[in-house]
Amino acid sequence: MSFSPLIRQLIDGLRILPGVGQKTAQRMALQLLERDRSGGLRLAQALTQAMEGVGHCRQCRTLTEQELCPQCADTRRDDTQLCVVEGPTDVYAVEQTGYRGRYFVLKGHLSPLDGLGPEAIGIPQLMARIEEQGTFTEVILATNPTVEGEATAHYIAQLLSEKGLAATRIAHGVPLGGELELVDGGTLAHAIAGRRPISL
């Protein structure tokens, strides 16, 4: 089926969203145009406002509408811990755990094949933040448990070690409530390698 230029433009615009393919984008576009024009206009307005009004926190680099995000502006947070994550969505995930330290958001992970070296993801800015703050005694490396995430964590840990700073890595393994028979071998191997004594 061939669509008019404006409908095609809408479909192509929706396809930039993660997980949205051609068919899903077509259904979304037609739903907005046929059944929910007011919803489509609200969506367009919200997108425009977000694209114009949301930027990056000058300290941690997460998404915010202010110069400082709520976490960086909060003076009650622990200034001895810095949690390093790959993206803004990771900040929201870590916040759900009750973590009360500071953050630094990389722009992804190291990936030489994709041309993403230390400068591209912000490692020099991370090291400058640690040096300027001067209060961090622990840097928690909360990058994803992928090959690239592990390489990124290892690279940062090496830089921190050269400066005499402690780096820790988030644990990963068997999910709470999970059954061993359903866990993949790599995850189970990490869980066994990262085992710890039971405190009584």
From Swiss-Prot:
CDD domains, per the entry: TOPRIM_recR
ZnF locations on chain (C4-type): 57-72
Record-linked SMART domains: TOPRIM
Entries under InterPro entries matching the protein: DNA_Rcmb_RecR, Rcmb_RecR, Rcmb_RecR_Znf, TOPRIM_dom, TOPRIM_RecR
SUPFAM superfamilies in the cross-refs: Recombination protein RecR (SSF111304)
Domain Toprim, first and last residues per copy: 80-175
A GO biological-process term: DNA recombination
GO molecular function, one term: zinc ion binding
Keyword annotations: DNA damage, DNA recombination, DNA repair, Metal-binding, Zinc, Zinc-finger
Family: Belongs to the RecR family.
Name of the protein this chain belongs to: Recombination protein RecR
Naturally occurring in which organism (per UniProt): Pseudomonas putida (strain GB-1)
Source organism phylogeny: Bacteria, Pseudomonadati, Pseudomonadota, Gammaproteobacteria, Pseudomonadales
